Amino acid sequence: MFGFGVGIFFFGYFIFEVPSNLILEKVGARRWIARIMISWGVISSAFAFVPSISAVLQSVGLSFFDNARTFYLLRFIFGAAEAGFFPGIILFLTYWFTGHERARWVGVFMAAIPLSAVIGGPLSGLILDAFDGIMGLSGWQWLFVVEGVPAVLLGLWVFSYLTDKPREAAWLAPDERIALQARLDDERKSREAIRHYTLGEALKNPRVLALSVVYFGIVSGNYGLSY
């Protein structure tokens, strides 16, 4: 049951990842990244109350949703909510940094992933032990709540303060906005002159295939150890 619940997350993620990034391009990073963070936090907190949610669903005639199926449903929605966050952040960085600068900031972003695991493990253990029984909730329930609430709050902050693109940055001087946007536009024009490949051509490229196999191995190892 647990393994299926873990795996169904990726179905939601896979289905909605590309549409999510396309929507981000249309509505702007500020709105869409904030939406991802807020919905992620809300659903993460909801895992603490699976039995209660199951009871509500059954009370309105959806008797199919016992605790296990409610857990599966939340995991699928959780994947759909998170879909697009990682590529969305990478896309957002292209709005602000040239290719030469971008590698450094992508590295900083990627470094946060293992750092969160280093900090999150001991912190999770502390929450499980110290919060157990508070307000009638078990430690594992508090773990989901404490995980979800900061994401919601940070999402609200992102919605209020994140700036989509340099031309909209009121905190930059006018000449700084113009200079930065000009550099980015020049790089974009040079990229447009490069031949673009179709999806089929990319999938036939030996380097793409090799990197896909390597990345699949990395992700499989990470999630295998995590779960």
Residue ranges and their predicted role:
Residues M1-I15:
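Extracellular/periplasmic helix-loop-helix junction of adjacent transmembrane segments
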Residues I15-A29:
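Helix-to-loop junctions at the C-terminal end of transmembrane segments
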Residues I38-F65:
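C-terminal ends and interior cores of transmembrane alpha-helices
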Residues L74-A111:
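Cytoplasmic helix-loop-helix junction between adjacent transmembrane helices
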Residues A103-D129, P150-A151:
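Glycine-rich segments within core transmembrane alpha-helices of 12-TM secondary carriers
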Residues R104, F109, M135-L199:
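Central mid-sequence intracellular linker of multi-pass
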Residues G200-Y227:
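Extracytoplasmic gate region of multi-pass secondary transporters
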